[in-house]
A protein has these predicted regions:
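The feature captures the beta-strand-to-loop junction immediately N-terminal to the Walker
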Residues: 37-39
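Helix-to-loop junction immediately C-terminal to a conserved catalytic motif
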Residues: 52
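Conserved ABC transporter NBD signature motif
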Residues: 60-68, 80, 112-114, 119
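Conserved ABC ATPase signature
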Residues: 131-135, 139
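ABC ATPase C-loop
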Residues: 148-149
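Catalytic Walker B motif of ABC-type/P-loop ATPase nucleotide-binding domains
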Residues: 156-160
Length: 240
């Protein structure tokens, strides 16, 4: 078996004296979609930020494409081919959709050009001249994904893409993520909506209070709603 594209081992991260992550380990293979699930405050976003170098871990290791990148600054991690779609869809609100994409575009080029992003996200093409601050929540999520793609990553970390969006828009966002997966881009997907994420992922992890409490096939977990309730303490009877 080949080494994973991303390998996180025994990661511990603190904010001041407060320990957030406790020996978190996970992996993402080349072209694989992996779901990282858990309730608010479980440590999902901190895990992503620790991988990206935005919140350096206090111990443990992060390896990407065989290279240890633990604690590297975020810009160096991005240059290696790691994209990020953050919670809250941060972007330049006073710049147009096109200008946001141009700022994020990889100067070295690659298969994901702005033209290709517009082909896969035709709504963005229609809105290329509109300022990002005037886009709807769903349109901003699509722009955030587009910004990550034009950097031509091998791996994208996607944080809560369904948050605050109407069901039809969520469906469209997940259609786009499915296309990315089919194109060979690896995805680490953080999501509170467990069943939604499990539909697209091959494997799933569950975090609880900064500790990893589950790892296994996504389809297996999706078929056991009692197990999801036990792991996440949530009612999934109508979810997904």
């Amino acid at each position: 078996m080949s080494d994973p594209l991303l390998a996180v081992e025994k990661l511990c991260t603190s904010y001041g004296k407060i320990r957030i992550l406790r020996d978190v380990s996970l992996s993402v293979g080349e072209g694989e979609c992996v779901a990282l699930l858990g309730l608010n405050g479980a440590g999902k976003t901190t895990t992503m930020r620790s991988i990206l170098g935005l919140t350096p871990p206090t111990s443990g290791t992060v390896r990407y494409a065989g290279r240890e990148i633990t604690g590297w600054p975020a810009y160096k991690v991005a240059r290696l081919g790691v994209g990020y779609v953050p919670e809250g869809r941060r972007m330049f609100r006073d710049l147009s959709t096109l200008e946001n994409l141009q700022l994020a575009e990889n100067a070295r080029g690659g298969t994901w050009t702005i033209a290709r992003v517009f082909e896969h996200l035709p709504k963005l093409a229609e809105l290329r001249a509109r300022k990002a601050g005037r886009l709807s929540g769903g349109e901003q999520e699509m722009l955030a994904i587009g910004r990550a793609l034009v950097a031509n990553p091998r791996l994208i970390l996607v944080d809560e893409p369904s948050q605050g969006l109407a069901p039809l828009i969520v469906e469209e966002v997940y259609r786009i993520l499915g296309e990315l997966k089919a194109s060979g881009v690896a995805i680490l997907l953080v999501e509170q909506n467990a069943l939604l994420a499990l539909k697209i992922a091959e494997r799933a992890y569950v975090l609880d209070s900064g500790r990893m409490v589950h790892e296994g096939p996504a389809a297996e977990l999706a078929g056991d709603r009692d197990r999801i309730r036990t792991l996440m303490g949530m009612d999934v009877s109508t979810t997904g």
